[in-house]
Structures are given as structure tokens and as C-alpha cells.
């Protein structure tokens, strides 16, 4: 099988075959990461540039480590110390890196659509350079959606994670869905896998029209937590993004936790083997109680971090021209 997609800008148009290629390749790199020397020369000589116009430690570090594990040369762009502060446009900055011989651009921006703009400019120039969206505004965060998918499938079958494992499985996504690009990518991936996706959150953070977020599908929307949790096999809880919120969307963090915080008592409504995911960073005592957060038998948060490196290795490898066995 050969990867055909030059840019990964979102999951809205991902095919089942593409999801499966990412899962299969991620599983291979997850094995690489367990070796004494967790490094392979597959992208040796390639130049990967991280263009992060929005603060990030976890995602940027994960991408940088993934690229280095593939033996790529990594350039980290910092807008505060760049020519952008002197008036250079974003496109001019990107053109500079293209002229330097970059092979892959990893882009994170607070404004939705910026990675698409860069990809359009690259396509206009006929360049083979790929753009990988590391999160853009309220649009999408495709690598988080893919690593969450890989984490879920790997939990159900560590040796052969695959899309169909989630068919008919109830998964609740809880929290600030309105401001979450992670939620949007997760929804696309989980619906593609055939999961039964339920959305839960306060009315101010979960508009009713999210029920029709994926064309051709109707997602249950709950403004109370309990119906979403009943029988759920997995629960993905989201960070309250206070930096993106206007005033008056929430009375207080304490009230949010009272109605939507995940506690051990509330989780008794779920499947007996329920597992929790969270994209991080976690607001302890808000989205999750400290008791739940500290229980490694209950949450898959550390696995998400580990799997994030493997999934990003897989995407960089595939976009860099790598193949997987048929």
C-alpha cells in the first residue's frame, strides 16, 4: 500500500484505508519505541520544520521526538524571535523554509485555516513538501484524533489495532466541545470506526447542532452527564479552554465539576471496564477528580502520550514517502 495524501490537514475526508494505514504503521513504530535503541534511519536526510505560532509544549515535543526517532533533521521555528516580529508575513516565512530545502512543515496556529493556506501555496508552486496540521484554531487537531483512535484500538487488541474493533462501542466525549478542535477530530475518527459516539456538556459549551456535525450521522447530545456515561466503554474528557471562552459561559469551575466532573462514583454508570482519555493538560478537580487521575488502571492518559510519538512517527514516515507492507 502507498500513502497518497501530500498534506494532512484534518480527518473530515480521511478514508477507512487511510485510518488503517496509520494504525498499522503506528503499531510498527510503537514496537520500535520499546527497543534499546528506539531509532530508525527512515527519514535520514529529510528536513522537518515545526512552525508553531501558538504556545505548545506537549505537542511540539512529541513531534520533535517523533522526527528525531526517524533520524530527520528538525528545525524549530519560534515566532517571538523571528522575522515575523519585524513585519514578515506568515507565507513569506514559509517560503523561506521551502527555499532552505524543507521536506515537511508541521504547523500549529490559533487561527483556523492557516495550514490550509500554506498547503495551497505549496500546491500552487508545484512543490512536493507536505503540511501536517498540529492544531488550527477551532478547526481540527488531526494527530490527536489519530492518537486517540490508536490508543482505543490498541487497548482492545495490542497486537493488531484496527478500525473495526470500535464498531458499536459506546464512547462518550465530555466537556468543552464548542472550543475543542480535539473533539472535532475525535468525532470524525470515531464515527468512521463505527463507534456509538455520545456528546455531553453544558448547553453553553455544547450547541445542539453538534448532533449533525458529521454529515449523514446524528450524534446524541446530552446536557446532563449521566445519560452519556451509562454503559460507556470509553470516556474522552476535554480540557476547559478558558483562554478561548468569553464571559458567562460557565458560572464557575466548581460548578462545572459538580455537574460534569468525572469521579469514581459517576464512573459506576459506565461499563465495568471503562477507561478514560484526556488530551491534556488536565485541570485536576475540574474535568477529573484527583482520585481518578491517579488511578492507572482507570485512565489511559500516559498511553496517549506514548502513542502520540508513535502515531506522529507514522504520519511523518508516510508523508515522507514510506511504504507499509500490503
Curated annotation (Swiss-Prot):
What name does the UniProt record give this protein?
Aspartate carbamoyltransferase catalytic subunit
Q: Does the keyword Transcription regulation apply?
A: no
Biological processes per GO annotation: 'de novo' pyrimidine nucleobase biosynthetic process; 'de novo' UMP biosynthetic process; amino acid metabolic process
Q: Which organism is it from?
A: Synechococcus sp. (strain JA-3-3Ab) (Cyanobacteria bacterium Yellowstone A-Prime)
Pathway membership: Pyrimidine metabolism; UMP biosynthesis via de novo pathway; (S)-dihydroorotate from bicarbonate: step 2/3
Q: Which keywords does this Swiss-Prot/TrEMBL entry list?
A: Pyrimidine biosynthesis, Transferase
- Transmembrane ranges, per UniProt, are none
Q: What does this protein do?
A: Catalyzes the condensation of carbamoyl phosphate and aspartate to form carbamoyl aspartate and inorganic phosphate, the committed step in the de novo pyrimidine nucleotide biosynthesis pathway.
